[in-house]
Amino acid sequence: MRVMGIRMNYQHLWKWGIMLLGILMTCSVAEDLWVTVYYGVPVWKEATTTLFCASDAKSYEPEAHNIWATHACVPTDPNPREIEMENVTENFNMWKNNMVEQMHEDIISLWDQNLKPCVKLTPLCVTLNCTNAGGNKTTNGNNTTNQEEQMMEKGEMKNCSFNITTVISDKKKQVHALFYRLDVVPIDDDNSANTSNTNYTNYRLINCNTSAITQACPKVTFEPIPIHYCAPAGFAILKCKDKKFNGTGPCKKVSTVQCTHGIRPVVSTQLLLNGSLAEEEIIIRSENLTNNVKTIIVHLNESVEINCTRPDNKITRQSTPIGLGQALYTTRIKGDIRQAYCNISAAAWNKTLQQVAKKLGDLLNQTTIIFKPPAGGDPEITTHSFNCGGEFFYCNTSRLFNSTWNSSTWNNDTLNSEGTIKLPCRIKQIINMWQGVGKAMYAPPIEGLIKCTSNITGLLLTRDGGVNNSTNETFRPGGGDMKDNWRNELYKYKVVRIEPLGIAPTRAKRRVVEREKRAIGLGAVFLGFLGAAGSTMGAVSVALTGQARQLLSGIVQQQNNLLRAIEAQQHMLQLTVWGIKQLQARVLAVESYLKDQQLLGIWGCSGKHICTTTVPWNSSWSNKSLEEIWNNMTWIEWEREIDNYTGVIYSLIENSQIQQEKNEQDLLQLDKWASLWNWFSITKWLWYIKIFIMIVGGLIGLRIVFTVLSLVNRVRQGYSPLSFQTLLPAPRGPDRPEGIEEEGGEQGRDRSIRLVNGFSALFWDDLRNLCLFSYHRLRDLILIATRIVELLGRRGWEAIKYLWSLLQYWTQELKNSFISLLNATAIAVAEGTDRIIELIRRAFRAVLHIPRRVRQGLERALL
């Protein structure tokens, strides 16, 4: 009755409880998603890494010690692979490309390394007594179509004498040498003033007070050889194939390559030589076209040939000793000195400049484009400086950049330009090194005639500042920062790091923990399966095995090539820049492979392409449905969406695997009981224990809830408890008197227990009552379960006995019926047999009586 009263008082609570139970049951059957690890997915991230070089150095002269040291590179692949990536859009930025920085550092290191063993010209920082050597030219040479070789201006070369220390340190001797005027500067002192009336003037080398001068070794050549930059294993090079790509922004035509195309490290200013060409139209590239400080790179679509010549002035190289075991190689000229020059086709140049002007006018919305010579600066900037046959040319380009174009001229297809543009050039032997401040190089003279033919494939321009509302824009040739030269070739490349480990939600959950014996051969991918980067996640996941087979084999092949290149340098006292990079590439490949395998081992996924886990998928990472993820998204899109949570997911997988290994160890320790209780699964026992704990916890929770509800109900009825302690009725003993004399009627046997003071006593009393309550309920539950089992056993035994007796009865009935059937059959057969025998006997008798009947008939007839 008490229970029924509580149910009636809290009927609405029962309804809410039933509703809550239904909601929990509905949620419990909802679809659960689990984290699954995939190895070999086509995912990448932007990265910076050490690139190594590949070059076909065997096709060039083997005897020459080329400064680029391409003999130390790995051989180029005769069949380079390029994998198209469909449905992939990638962002490129040529102005923030680490490949440019790396190439710049490599070229600087190569120059420094090749010049390190060469002679230092510090002893030459002495006073030079110089006179003019040869050259009687008086014309200004402004005729742009005159191709005859012109004489060098008077004073262009100096015949200098100076004192040098001999092998014996306390003795000096005077020697003579020829220097170009650009390589020496006059000394303004008293001695020069005293000799002003003579033909001698005091000079010094131009770099003596600012730079350390090193003479290039005699056998060093500067002819550029194409260098291919290659990514190590675990990395890839993405290439933009958009023909109109300006170097920054998204590119929708992306492919992946192992190495770049052959890049010639041509060191030049104003004009870019022997590079690649734009495939369709001229491309203008600038970090900010409206900022006149930024350099503008013009990528031509058609090359313009430039032919440069230094006439044979009967130049010979003479060796001048400047110290113990050191020699200065100077120039000796017999006869007149003719000037170096370069020739460019006027028609080809004007056509190119016309297209450049039109392109600049369209981009800047200007009606007039003006080209002017440089305003001033170092000779390397004001002239077109480059290396030709070992000599460093400085050519005046004022005849190339001295024109004005407007909408009427740049749209004119019939330009009157004939003949050849001739650029006067000067030669320097003391070169300001472009690698940095404070370095200079002395280039020994080259004997004989020098000719070189190059292709102009780009321009370096700067824009003049001024009034913004002007309709005219003035551009001048520039350069000097060699990074711009490399950018014009590397604008379409970027290096990415392959992330072969992918995580995604699936319905599969790891059920059985198995220890793998060994890991399969999976390495860091560098090319191969990136062709599937544009496919959906579901399409890629079914082909992971085939994709992963290429990985380790690619690493091994690349490692062998690098090792052969390193072994080829063992005869050298030190490795070149390329050798160091090859060693770094080998280390990077191994590190990348071991890192991935370590993660797979920590997660318990060694040797698996697809590995399920016990980590539930959290919708806060991504709330997309499975169908939307696997059917509509690519792996790279998915990776970018969950990139912020990969670290958290990795740690959860690791912690889950650690816990799983602990559980496995515990299970192995309990496995000895399986022989005794093999009809039960150990995991089931753990499940039973969990259910038992849940039931006990539920009972305790219900006890607390009902206690609180009872207290609230009494408060609502006007009863205020003395304390937070709930007073439970305690039954009186049978030997205690009940009530007092004044009380009448039947009294109950309940009384209130005493109150306790203090928090500890109150807590202990409540805890004891709660434990007693749980014990009593559990005891009642066990008794009820025992009675149920006993009742079910008794009823079951009675049912079995009834079924057994019923079986015996029906068996007996079937036996009797079968016997009766046999008896009836036997009787029927016997009776039928008797009748047949009787009929046969009667028939036989009838046959036997036929003669008698015939005789009797005849007798009657005769009577």
UniProtKB/Swiss-Prot annotation:
Under the heading Pfam families, the entry gives: GP120, GP41
Where is the segment annotated CD4-binding loop?
374-384
The entry's comment on post-translational modification says: Highly glycosylated by host. The high number of glycan on the protein is reffered to as 'glycan shield' because it contributes to hide protein sequence from adaptive immune system. Palmitoylation of the transmembrane protein and of Env polyprotein (prior to its proteolytic cleavage) is essential for their association with host cell membrane lipid rafts. Palmitoylation is therefore required for envelope trafficking to classical lipid rafts, but not for viral replication.
MPER: region residues: 669-690
Region V4, annotated ranges: 395-425
Keywords of this entry: AIDS, Apoptosis, Clathrin-mediated endocytosis of virus by host, Cleavage on pair of basic residues, Coiled coil, Disulfide bond, Fusion of virus membrane with host endosomal membrane, Fusion of virus membrane with host membrane, Glycoprotein, Host cell membrane, Host endosome, Host membrane, Host-virus interaction, Lipoprotein, Membrane, Palmitate, Signal, Transmembrane, Transmembrane helix, Viral attachment to host cell, Viral envelope protein, Viral immunoevasion, Viral penetration into host cytoplasm, Virion, Virus endocytosis by host, Virus entry into host cell
Query: Fusion peptide: where is this region?
Result: 519-539
* Coiled coil stretches, renumbered: 640-674
Q: Where is this motif: Di-leucine internalization motif?
A: 862-863
This protein's GO CC annotations: host cell endosome membrane; host cell plasma membrane; membrane; viral envelope; virion membrane
Specify where the region named Immunosuppression lies, as residue ranges. 581-599
Where is this chain glycosylated?
87, 129, 136, 142-143, 159, 163, 194, 199, 209, 246, 274, 288, 301, 307, 343, 350, 365, 396, 402, 406, 412, 455, 468-469, 472, 618, 623, 632, 644
UniProt signal peptide? 1-31
| Superkingdom of origin organism | Viruses
- Residues annotated as region V1? 130-159
* Residue segments, region V5: 467-478, 470-478
The set of disulfide-linked cysteines is 53-73, 118-217, 125-208, 130-160, 230-259, 240-251, 308-342, 388-452, 395-425, 605-611
HAMAP family per UniProt: HIV_ENV
Q: What is known of its domains?
A: Some of the most genetically diverse regions of the viral genome are present in Env. They are called variable regions 1 through 5 (V1 through V5). Coreceptor usage of gp120 is determined mainly by the primary structure of the third variable region (V3) in the outer domain of gp120. The sequence of V3 determines which coreceptor, CCR5 and/or CXCR4 (corresponding to R5/macrophage, X4/T cell and R5X4/T cell and macrophage tropism), is used to trigger the fusion potential of the Env complex, and hence which cells the virus can infect. Binding to CCR5 involves a region adjacent in addition to V3.
Something else known: Inhibitors targeting HIV-1 viral envelope proteins are used as antiretroviral drugs. Attachment of virions to the cell surface via non-specific interactions and CD4 binding can be blocked by inhibitors that include cyanovirin-N, cyclotriazadisulfonamide analogs, PRO 2000, TNX 355 and PRO 542. In addition, BMS 806 can block CD4-induced conformational changes. Env interactions with the coreceptor molecules can be targeted by CCR5 antagonists including SCH-D, maraviroc (UK 427857) and aplaviroc (GW 873140), and the CXCR4 antagonist AMD 070. HIV-1 lineages are divided in three main groups, M (for Major), O (for Outlier), and N (for New, or Non-M, Non-O). The vast majority of strains found worldwide belong to the group M. Group O seems to be endemic to and largely confined to Cameroon and neighboring countries in West Central Africa, where these viruses represent a small minority of HIV-1 strains. The group N is represented by a limited number of isolates from Cameroonian persons. The group M is further subdivided in 9 clades or subtypes (A to D, F to H, J and K).
What is the name of the protein in this document? Envelope glycoprotein gp160
In its UniProt entry, the species of origin is given as Human immunodeficiency virus type 1 group M subtype D (isolate Z84)
Q: What is the lineage of its organism?
A: Viruses, Riboviria, Pararnavirae, Artverviricota, Revtraviricetes
